[in-house]
Amino acid sequence: MIWTRLPLYGHSKPSTGGWQPLRFDGGAFHLKRTAELARALLVLRLCAWPPLVTHGLAFQAWSQRLLGSRLSGALLRASIYGQFVAGETAEEVRGCVQQLQAIGLQPLLAVPTEEEPDSAAKTSEAWYEGNLSAMLHCVDLSRAVADAHGPARNSLMQLKVTALTSPRLCKELSAWIQRPRGSSELRPERLAEAMESGRNLQLSCLSTEQNQHLQASLSRLHRVAQHARAQDVRLLVDAEYTFINPALSLLVAALAMRLDSSEEEGPWVWNTYQAYLKDTHERLERDAKAAHEAGLAFGVKLVRGAYLDKERSVTQLHGKEDCTQPDYEATSRSYSRCLELMLRRVSNHGPRCHLMVASHNEESIRQATRRMWELGIPLDGPVCFGQLLGMCDHVSLALGQAGYMVYKSIPYGCLEEVIPYLIRRAQENRSVLQGARREQALLSQELWRRLLGRTA
């Protein structure tokens, strides 16, 4: 549940004219160079090969031993890294963003960090402090690219809470939150006050060491939020695993309370809702109503969800009831219901309610654009769209050329850090990668058209 006061965007004219269904037929590929299309086709086909995704880290290690680090790195930069990553330096990121904005797309920068540190060194406060520095730099970079190439009011970036606090602590807090007597001790107001004052909460459910880590985590979150607000950058908080999401929602709600100001506009922090969970529509409706009753703005990033396999394996391991939708069709119905709920709230409550339709599904995009027109929601208003860099360009480009606000999620960083991150994200998004067959077909069609010299 995330709330802040006042609108993010000014009032603008609603969508005019008759609604025309967008054509996701690859027609907008004329904006891309042939080399970019060829790389996209090659990489997407590789990523749709299950063994490569499953054993990606092993393949990377094998290629380094066989080819050497330099040649292996060059091949990765020319393929997977170049397709999905903006670059390593600030200049490379700026160049990538400039290319995107030239074709009607906006950046949503992301620091590639792992939510489950896999070594003792990465569980220390020093590792989280290093992530804090990276997040603060991401805020600065998000503002810099907006100032250079686009409207600063639309600056957004992704924030992964478990880059700044331990997943184990979040799991402990989540378990406590779900107990009847735990809810009174763990109130967002208490955490928000601790963020501001710096005083240790001394929660009874945590050990001394855990309380100290919680206080340090609150301080880190507060610093990122304050800096983002000062730079006019909005924070979109990533969803994570169900067993830690209650704690993440608590932390985000506390964070939003610290950002509430009558002198600034809009939802500074947006939470992510995963449609593949059975209770998402109910939670979304409850949170939206609570925000409205409190007179606060409400920001939502709506996704289908990327942790299905892990969620089900954890459920089976602990003998718990499956919290996920039974199949993709049920998830799509859930997404459609949540989308309709949020679009109606945007229509009824104007700039106090904001939504990112984060989806690669063409039918969901069509539903959103049709309902925006029917409800009179302006194209440059409180509803925007989001897709991953290097994927779903036939949808992103069509939306951007039609005048919608479209963001590409853009990781950046050095090869050694980003490749393991990309492989793990690919493992989480197997269904998306394997479902990109239509995009591959459109890319192939466009490449053949160019090779044969045919007109579009």
UniProtKB/Swiss-Prot annotation:
Cellular component terms (Gene Ontology): mitochondrion
Gene Ontology biological process terms in this record: proline catabolic process to glutamate
Keywords: Acetylation, FAD, Flavoprotein, Oxidoreductase, Proline metabolism
Chain positions found as N6-acetyllysine: K310, K320
Catalytic activity reported: trans-4-hydroxy-L-proline + a quinone = (3R,5S)-1-pyrroline-3-hydroxy-5-carboxylate + a quinol + H(+); L-proline + a quinone = (S)-1-pyrroline-5-carboxylate + a quinol + H(+)
Uppermost EC category: oxidoreductase
Cofactor: FAD
A molecular function GO annotation: oxidoreductase activity, acting on the CH-NH group of donors
Gene3D superfamilies the record matches: 3.20.20.220
EC nos: 1.5.5.3, 1.5.5.2
Keyword check for Acetylation: yes
Task performed by this protein: Dehydrogenase that converts trans-4-L-hydroxyproline to delta-1-pyrroline-3-hydroxy-5-carboxylate (Hyp) using ubiquinone-10 as the terminal electron acceptor. Can also use proline as a substrate but with a very much lower efficiency. Does not react with other diastereomers of Hyp: trans-4-D-hydroxyproline and cis-4-L-hydroxyproline. Ubiquininone analogs such as menadione, duroquinone and ubiquinone-1 react more efficiently than oxygen as the terminal electron acceptor during catalysis.
Family named by the database record: Belongs to the proline oxidase family.
UniProt protein name: Hydroxyproline dehydrogenase
The encoding gene: Prodh2
